[in-house]
């Protein structure tokens, strides 16, 4: 009976979504990730300068563009874009977590959920950035976002989905790698959702060369810098740190790769 039911593609897809929802809550929803863009290459001026330069060229971002960054963290990317292009319109970020250690310059950050922001504002945008954030929204939240954002973008607007590439070179310990692989698999479902609602125009990779000491990287793991580390027990973190110590050199050199997909 179950085999017959699963032959129905619509039902099978619903099962996949249900599984993905369980995965999201298991991996990500216990607490917000405060440290992903703090005190690491992920928050360095060089990192955001290189990403900003590539986005400006790839998306042809000009000074009159109106930009929204969903889940902007401390606003480093928006700030860099604003400085590089001298934007006429102050770019806007939406971030539910308020970071008291950071005062943004030349940008406006709203501390709320993206759906609350869209409900309470009538602003129109030319560019919407979704950098490693969609997996943190539930399916219902994403559905509402896909519906509501269409009322807040101009005719030729671009929606930019930026996510970790599945060929990552980031140093991992086994449990961390297992959880990350599960997370990366969910990107396919997110892409299906986006292509159901928007048209995929183009894509390319952003490659950043990282040089960091082993001790600095271990401290990032202790701070649970990735969402997949959030629900690990302290013992699991310490065991992971021992694995990294025993399997990597004192100076880490690797490439951090993001995939940039542009929808319209």
Show which residues each predicted segment covers:
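Conserved class I S-adenosyl-L-methionine
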Residues: 2-6, 11-60, 64-73, 76, 158-185
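Class I SAM-dependent methyltransferase SAM/SAH-binding core
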Residues: 74-117
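A conserved beta-strand element that flanks and buttresses the S-adenosyl-L-methionine
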Residues: 129
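A short glycine-rich, Lys/Arg-flanked "PGG" loop and its adjoining helix->strand segment in the class I
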Residues: 143-155
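Short alpha-helix
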Residues: 183-197
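Conserved Class I S-adenosyl-L-methionine
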Residues: 202-264
């Amino acid at each position: 009976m179950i085999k017959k039911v699963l032959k129905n593609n619509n039902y099978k897809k619903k099962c996949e979504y249900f599984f993905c929802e369980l995965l999201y809550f298991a991996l990500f929803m216990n607490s917000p990730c405060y440290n992903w863009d703090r005190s690491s290459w992920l928050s360095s001026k060089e990192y955001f300068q290189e990403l900003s330069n590539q986005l400006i060229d790839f998306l042809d971002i000009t000074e009159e563009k109106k930009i929204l960054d969903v889940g902007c963290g401390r606003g480093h990317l928006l700030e860099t874009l604003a400085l590089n292009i001298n934007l006429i319109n102050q770019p806007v970020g939406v971030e539910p977590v308020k970071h008291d250690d950071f005062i943004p310059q030349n940008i406006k950050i709203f501390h709320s959920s993206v759906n609350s922001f869209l409900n309470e504002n009538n602003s129109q945008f030319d560019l919407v950035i979704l950098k490693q954030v969609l997996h943190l929204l539930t399916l219902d939240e994403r559905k509402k976002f896909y519906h509501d954002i269409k009322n807040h973008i101009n005719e030729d607007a671009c929606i930019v989905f930026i996510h970790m590439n599945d060929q990552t070179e980031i140093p991992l310990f086994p449990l961390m790698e297992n959880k990350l692989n599960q997370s990366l698999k969910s990107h396919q479902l997110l892409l299906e959702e986006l292509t159901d609602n928007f048209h995929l125009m183009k894509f390319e990779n952003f490659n950043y060369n990282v040089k960091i000491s082993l001790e600095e990287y271990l401290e990032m793991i202790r701070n649970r810098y990735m969402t997949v580390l959030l629900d690990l027990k302290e013992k699991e973190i310490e065991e992971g740190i021992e694995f990294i110590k025993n399997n990597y050199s004192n100076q880490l050199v690797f490439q951090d790769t993001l995939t940039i997909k542009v929808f319209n």
